[in-house]
UniProtKB/Swiss-Prot annotation:
Gene label: NA
Active site: D123 (proton donor/acceptor), Y374 (nucleophile)
Species whose genome carries this gene: Influenza A virus (strain A/Goose/Guangxi/345/2005 H5N1 genotype G)
Membrane topology of the entry: Single-pass type II membrane protein
Enzyme class name: hydrolase
Name of the featured protein: Neuraminidase
């Protein structure tokens, strides 16, 4: 009958509704259960990634054997800065963690082709800051990370975090602020009250400890020099060098077989470069590179060297570097003996210990007709490269503007090279910017 049919339809409809409600409840329970399980899985993955990303840069390997230098980066920052927002900088340097290489630089708190770039030939001001960006990129407000307030600086990575050292303050009482993972961890006060200053290149890390060299005192006479050992951004030991008649400024330091070697600038009376090497307990040795292939600028023509300071043209100087290989040495230097122009790498197979001026390899980096500037060393650890040795690298600052050119500003770009045991080439990789800029006219 019609009534029976309606009853059956009603029962079926009721059963479907009950089934639908059960289905919704089960689905909701499954989703809630999954949500409750997502967080611990996500946390586990996050912790695992952090564990993988943190290592100790041992620094126990020797420098890699090399035959020459392969171009690694060029930032073209002055060329780009004629139109784009690029910082006015000087004293750029490169440092690498086990994951990346970064360019560090001292800004002037100003952009190229802007009114605040006026007068930036000055070295020390309260506006100068240490910042960093990925290597090879032009330093701009859009890709750069603030590191420290500084007119002299250093930075390095121990495998866990970045250590930065930024010196700022008055000439007669500056303070170095140490930061680890971005947080202030320690300070070092000027002990001679005469322009405390440091490397302007990377510090060196071995087995979780990082090392730097600082200078305090005259730039044209006997000063005071200290080595500092730091762990997680705190000074754990320091030693003042007993180095009469030596002058150390702006040291370029690197690890080699668990020890540290630094090659520095003698601004007092040496046209060859002084060095200091030390172990992790800060037991040190000192000397000058003996080679008759002189590494500073200004300098005399190559001739007979000395294992002490070479006096002719010894006053003043420029930051530089060398890499020691046994009794041999790779010497980086300007091509011009009296101006900061050109750059070349020279292999002197006995130059660390012998005074003759013979060499076996010369590789051109920048032509003598183009400006260069400071240069310094950095290394790539096996944890970054996958090699079984520490790769030696260097950067060259290409200074433009004042005092040599008709601009209102002073700034620079940079290039870098790394040592390889394969084919390389001589060429010139200059800054290449056309000056003056609009702001200069």
């Amino acid at each position: 009958t019609i009534g029976s049919i309606c009853m059956v339809i009603g029962i079926v409809s009721l059963m479907l509704q009950i089934g639908n409600m059960i289905s919704i409840w089960v689905s909701h329970s499954i989703q809630t259960g999954n949500q409750n399980q997502v967080e611990p899985i996500s946390n586990t993955n996050f912790l695992t990634e952090k564990a993988v990303a943190s290592v100790t840069l041992a620094g126990n390997s020797s420098l890699c054997p090399i035959r020459g230098w392969a171009v690694h980066s060029k930032d073209n920052s002055i060329r780009i800065g004629s139109k784009g927002d690029v910082f006015v900088i000087r004293e750029p340097f490169i440092s690498c963690s086990h994951l990346e290489c970064r360019t560090f630089f001292l800004t002037q708190g100003a952009l190229l082709n802007d009114k605040h770039s006026n007068g930036t030939v000055k070295d020390r001001s309260p506006h100068r800051t240490l910042m960093s960006c990925p290597v090879g990129e032009a330093p701009s407000p859009y890709n750069s990370r603030f590191e420290s307030v500084a007119w002299s600086a250093s930075a390095c990575h121990d495998g866990t975090s970045w250590l930065t050292i930024g010196i700022s303050g008055p000439d007669n009482g500056a303070v170095a602020v140490l930061k680890y993972n971005g947080m202030i961890t320690d300070t070092i006060k000027s002990w001679r009250n005469n322009i405390l200053r440091t490397q302007e290149s990377e510090c060196a890390c071995v087995n979780g400890s990082c090392f730097t060299v600082m200078t305090d005192g005259p730039s044209n006479g006997q000063a005071s020099y200290k080595i500092f050992k730091m762990e997680k951004g705190k000074v754990v030991k320091s030693v003042e060098l007993d180095a009469p008649n030596y002058h150390y400024e702006e040291c370029s330091c690197y690890p080699d077989a668990g020890e540290i070697t630094c090659v520095c600038r003698d601004n007092w009376h040496g046209s060859n470069r002084p060095w200091v090497s030390f172990n992790q307990n800060l037991e040190y040795q000192i000397g000058y590179i003996c080679s008759g292939v002189f590494g500073d600028n200004p300098r005399p023509n190559d001739g007979t060297g000395s294992c002490g300071p070479v006096s002719p043209n010894g006053a003043y100087g420029v930051k530089g570097f060398s890499f020691k290989y046994g009794n041999g040495v790779w010497i980086g230097r300007t091509k011009s003996p009296n101006s900061r122009s050109g750059f070349e790498m020279i292999w002197d197979p006995n130059g660390w210990t012998e005074t003759d001026s013979s060499f076996s390899v010369k590789q051109d980096i920048v032509a003598i007709t183009d400006w260069s500037g400071y240069s310094g060393s950095f290394v790539q650890h096996p944890e970054l490269t996958g090699l079984d040795c520490i790769r030696p690298c260097f950067w060259v600052e290409l200074i433009r503007g004042r005092p040599k050119e008709s601009t209102i500003w002073t700034s620079g770009s940079s290039i870098s090279f790394c040592g390889v045991n394969s084919d390389t080439v001589s060429w010139s990789w200059p800054d290449g910017a056309e000056l003056p800029f609009t702001i200069d006219k």
